[in-house]
Amino acid sequence: MKIAIGCDHIVTDTKMEVSQHLKSQGHEVIDVGTYDFTRTHYPIYGKKVGEKVASGEADLGVCICGTGVGISNAANKVPGVRTALVRDMTSALYSKEELNANVVSFGGKVAGELFIFDIVDAFIEAEYKPTEENKKLIAKINHLEAHNNDQADPHFFDEFLEKWNKGEYHD
């Protein structure tokens, strides 16, 4: 399976461990960054993971930031993406089996690597169980999406990166 993975600078080490774990399980990993500990902004990588999944280049996605909240919100803004921020096995399985989630997100400072490995493995193995009710619910959720042409611009976040580089944001 092809899995896109992305993170911000706070949890690059965790992302690298998850990536290695996925590769050891036989998955092809599409690493969209970040690749080091240089300050960056999590929405960039949530968007990149979401785009890989929405385009079909990746089957599923994994997003990691400090808490998981910011990066999951960014990924969820990509049309066609259903991201689940999970902190337990039940939520991970429910999101995939009932809501057909295609991206799973974590807080790398909240959950340990081995726990993340277990949840990612379960999420990948879980299968969507379509019912008339959940298909209608997913259709309603998908209807909420509005495509924004500005999102296709690769420089969409540049103004925030400039502020970040000037030290205007803090961890």
Curated annotation (Swiss-Prot):
Its EC number is 5.3.1.26. GO terms for biological process: D-allose catabolic process; galactose catabolic process; lactose catabolic process via tagatose-6-phosphate; pentose-phosphate shunt, non-oxidative branch. The keyword Isomerase applies. It comes from Staphylococcus epidermidis (strain ATCC 35984 / DSM 28319 / BCRC 17069 / CCUG 31568 / BM 3577 / RP62A). This is Galactose-6-phosphate isomerase subunit LacB. Disulfide bonds: none annotated. Heteromultimeric protein consisting of LacA and LacB. Belongs to the LacAB/RpiB family. Pathway: Carbohydrate metabolism; D-galactose 6-phosphate degradation; D-tagatose 6-phosphate from D-galactose 6-phosphate: step 1/1. PANTHER family: DNA DAMAGE-REPAIR_TOLERATION PROTEIN DRT102 (PTHR30345:SF0), RIBOSE-5-PHOSPHATE ISOMERASE B (PTHR30345). InterPro entries: LacB, RpiB_LacA_LacB, RpiB_LacA_LacB_sf. GO terms for molecular function: galactose-6-phosphate isomerase activity; ribose-5-phosphate isomerase activity. It is an enzyme of class 5 (isomerase). Keywords: Isomerase, Lactose metabolism. It catalyses: aldehydo-D-galactose 6-phosphate = keto-D-tagatose 6-phosphate. The keyword Isomerase applies.
